[in-house]
């Protein structure tokens, strides 16, 4: 009986990055659909072949994709199916229903699909990224982008089964077995506990950006956020803004012209750099608004922002612009504010609305945000079960 699904990728399981949050949520969702699961990701260090190779994280069985079983050494999963084959043999090939590969490099995805077809396992590609040019390394970018184009345009059709993070990407996969799963979380877990309800008392509004802005800030538009708060400070408005995921020095290395603005905001703006996932959630849990802004390009439209999912699950209002499927979940003026776009003027206007919101209206907004549990597993069980029932070998 084929009763097990393997989820494979470069999931940062120790740091609990966005990919790990996604993997653990999908594994819990698949288990809710009646399957057993195994996650092949990355621990902080590659386990020794004779060490304890298996860990349980949030109730899900996990192994390191670089050393999935004793023996080896194994070739890299980025170009070989050997680590997947070893894990499948450990479980029993005739028990593995599917292998889901998360944002795999093209060579690794091709090897995975070929292996699955040879042994009667259903190949799935979990695609949440369609990157564009990043940084200044020409050869690296050309090689990387060629692989990404091959994965998104050709290998998705070769696999025949694709998990999409957005309807924007799903619409580009005609004839393929697809499901849109932005995120699925077990919101009964302690990390998704919400803070006590706001009493509506007049106080300084607290804004948080928490995420990985990308190489050269290519993913998230940090510059308009800093410029917007500088404008609002000149207007005499009081606020607190915390930036998680990039330090002050790292930011100014990328945008040195903002040094005067950052200095002007020193009493209202705090850069925390990288923190643990648990610490990040604690800060988000106790803020008034989560903010982030992205260009409406294929990078933003293919994926779905983890920071949106986390804030929405914690019942925190969100200020952002419409990319991907965000417009389906964020109702302007109800559970947050939608900026008209990601430029400085548009970002300033949206944040200003958050600052001008009366205390009673803010309480109502928080209440509206908390009425929705948009990314709980129970919301996604039916479409996931339907997708798994249609899997193609």
What are these regions (language model features)?
Residues 25-28, 88, 107-109, 114-118, ...:
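Membrane-proximal helix-turn-helix segments that form the acceptor-binding/catalytic region
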Residues 22-28, 187-188, 192, 199-258, ...:
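Conserved catalytic-core segment of nucleotide-activated headgroup transferases in glycan assembly
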Residues 46-47, 80-83, 99-120, 125-127, ...:
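An aromatic- and histidine-rich active-site surface loop
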Residues 332-333, 337-344, 353-359:
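Conserved acidic donor-binding segment of nucleotide-sugar-dependent glycosyltransferases
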């Amino acid at each position: 009986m084929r009763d097990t699904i393997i989820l494979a990728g470069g999931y940062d399981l120790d740091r609990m990055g966005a990919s790990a949050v996604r993997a653990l949520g999908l594994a819990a969702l698949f288990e809710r659909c009646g399957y057993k699961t195994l996650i092949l990701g990355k621990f902080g260090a590659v386990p020794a072949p004779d060490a304890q190779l298996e860990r349980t994280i949030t109730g899900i069985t996990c192994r390191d994709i670089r050393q999935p079983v004793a023996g080896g050494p194994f070739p890299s999963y980025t170009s070989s199916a050997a680590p997947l084959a070893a894990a499948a043999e450990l479980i029993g090939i005739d028990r593995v229903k599917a292998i889901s590969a998360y944002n795999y490099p093209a060579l690794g995805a091709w090897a995975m699909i070929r292996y699955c077809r040879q042994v009667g396992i259903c190949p799935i590609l979990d695609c949440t990224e369609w990157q564009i040019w990043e940084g200044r390394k020409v050869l690296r970018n050309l090689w990387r982008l060629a692989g990404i184009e091959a994965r998104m345009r050709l290998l998705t059709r070769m696999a025949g089964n694709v998990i999409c993070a957005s309807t924007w990407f799903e619409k580009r996969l005609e004839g393929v077995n697809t499901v849109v799963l932005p995120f699925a979380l077990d919101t009964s877990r302690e990390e998704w506990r919400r803070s006590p309800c706001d009493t509506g008392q007049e106080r300084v509004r607290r804004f948080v950006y928490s995420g990985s802005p990308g190489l050269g800030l290519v993913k998230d538009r940090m510059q308009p956020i800093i410029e917007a708060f500088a404008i609002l400070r000149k207007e005499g408005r009081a606020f607190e803004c915390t930036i998680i995921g990039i330090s002050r020095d790292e930011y100014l290395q990328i945008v040195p012209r903002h040094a005067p603005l950052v200095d002007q905001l020193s009493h209202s703006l705090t850069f925390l750099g990288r923190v643990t996932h648990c610490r990040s959630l604690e800060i988000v849990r106790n803020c008034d608004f989560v903010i982030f802004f992205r260009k409406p390009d294929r990078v933003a439209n293919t994926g779905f922002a983890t920071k949106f999912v986390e804030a929405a699950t914690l019942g925190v209002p969100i200020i952002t612009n419409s990319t991907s499927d965000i417009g389906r979940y964020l109702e302007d003026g109800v559970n947050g504010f939608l900026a008209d776009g990601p430029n400085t003027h548009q970002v300033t206007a949206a944040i200003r609305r958050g600052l001008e919101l009366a205390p009673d209206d803010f309480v109502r907004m928080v209440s509206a945000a908390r009425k929705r549990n948009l990314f709980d597993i129970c919301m996604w069980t039916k479409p996931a079960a339907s997708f798994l029932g249609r899997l193609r070998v």
